[in-house]
Amino acid sequence: MIEGKTLRSDLQHLSRALRTLHKALLDVETQYFGNVGSALEHLQLVTSHPHFAWLQKLSGIISTLDECLDDEEALVVDLERRFRAEVEGLVGPLPASDEDFRQRYNAMLHDSPDVAMAHGALRKVLAQLPAAPAD
């Protein structure tokens, strides 16, 4: 089942690239926010404070992707296309699925070299996945 192994491997690469990007975005947002206190207080802020709310879309994609990786039956051929389209709707180049996310994301791309590097790595991973057919 080489195709299944390739599918799993491709999605694992995507998951890692998304987590790296997510961490870079959280680090920058945390700097913008200011002192957050303990790790527990930081976690509470990230999950419930409006300042970090825009990142929840990306968190949700990562969570869904990781759930699919844990469920062998969820690994279906179209999954790569679906996740590629979903991610590209957030970070580009597809039209924005969430305009607020896209604006904040683009600002961070310009403000943070770490975000820009993580974005570049993510784009390389996405380029390896099949694209959705053109309408």
Language model segments and positions:
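Surface-exposed peri-terminal alpha-helical interaction modules
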Residues: 1-135
